[in-house]
């Protein structure tokens, strides 16, 4: 399971012209689910995302996690993160989980984040989404479990 996390001043996701998720300061989490992923990996990745210290403290050092910084999450499914790009000129998505299982684990990940007390907005699984964001930094990390 992969999370590409971006520290943002704000972010939103729109489906068919309607805003379905919107946050102020926090993290945009692009989430990719692989074939061998499971609930344990979702829990571990949730813990890493929430615990990752990438927000500035009083000395502007990256010492605070998203919850300590008072931020929120916007979680958006993105199957292209699991693409194999090693060969050729077209990505292969053979490592990705089947859609039904990917959706289940995506929802499970979101639920785990919410259970830990952080405001969590979402996109819409498998929809054609428009994601808008204002990067803060920019600060972007690839987390994989």
From Swiss-Prot:
Alphabetical list of CDD domains matching this protein: Dtyr_deacylase
EC number: 3.1.1.96
Subcellular location: Cytoplasm
Key words, A-Z: Cytoplasm, Hydrolase, RNA-binding, tRNA-binding
Biological processes annotated in GO: D-amino acid catabolic process
Cellular component terms (Gene Ontology): cytoplasm
SUPFAM superfamilies given in the database record: DTD-like
Sequence motif Gly-cisPro motif, important for rejection of L-amino acids, location on chain: 137-138
Example of a GO MF term: tRNA binding
InterPro entries, per the entry: Daa-tRNA_deacyls_DTD (IPR003732), DTD-like_sf (IPR023509)
Gene3D superfamilies registered for this protein in UniProt: D-tyrosyl-tRNA(Tyr) deacylase
Top-rank lineage group of the source organism: Bacteria
Pfam families, alphabetized: Tyr_Deacylase (PF02580)
Catalytic activity field: glycyl-tRNA(Ala) + H2O = tRNA(Ala) + glycine + H(+); a D-aminoacyl-tRNA + H2O = a tRNA + a D-alpha-amino acid + H(+)
Domain remark from Swiss-Prot or TrEMBL: A Gly-cisPro motif from one monomer fits into the active site of the other monomer to allow specific chiral rejection of L-amino acids.
Task performed by this protein: An aminoacyl-tRNA editing enzyme that deacylates mischarged D-aminoacyl-tRNAs. Also deacylates mischarged glycyl-tRNA(Ala), protecting cells against glycine mischarging by AlaRS. Acts via tRNA-based rather than protein-based catalysis; rejects L-amino acids rather than detecting D-amino acids in the active site. By recycling D-aminoacyl-tRNA to D-amino acids and free tRNA molecules, this enzyme counteracts the toxicity associated with the formation of D-aminoacyl-tRNA entities in vivo and helps enforce protein L-homochirality.
Subunit structure: Homodimer.
Family per record: Belongs to the DTD family.
HAMAP family on file: Deacylase_Dtd
The name this protein goes by in its record: D-aminoacyl-tRNA deacylase
Organism of derivation: Serratia proteamaculans (strain 568)
